[in-house]
């Protein structure tokens, strides 16, 4: 035999990416990032602690100053809850129309 049936191949590396959509206020941003990356989150008091820095925007109906208004949205499986103004919504609104993209691509 010429050894055709014995192909030695390297093991394949498979990486699973679990996409999550998170909405938070400026005060909790660092904490959320550290929770998602697995690092300890110790956030010092900052300018967002004063009532005058509060602009009244909250997510999911929370309205008390200092209230944790973070939301964690599942992603990738299609079962997550999406807010009305997300990064993707803004991205898609700013994108050119498909006809423009096709024209640009065909000219290249």
UniProtKB/Swiss-Prot annotation:
Keyword Nucleus on entry: yes
Assigned keywords, A-Z: Nucleus
Domain of life: Eukaryota
Motif (VQ): 29-38
InterPro entries assigned: VQ, VQ_1/10
Principal localisation: nucleus
Region (Disordered): 65-85
GO CC entries: nucleus
GO biological process: response to oxidative stress
Subunit (UniProt): Interacts with WRKY25, WRKY26 and WRKY33.
Stated name of the protein: VQ motif-containing protein 10
Gene of this entry: VQ10
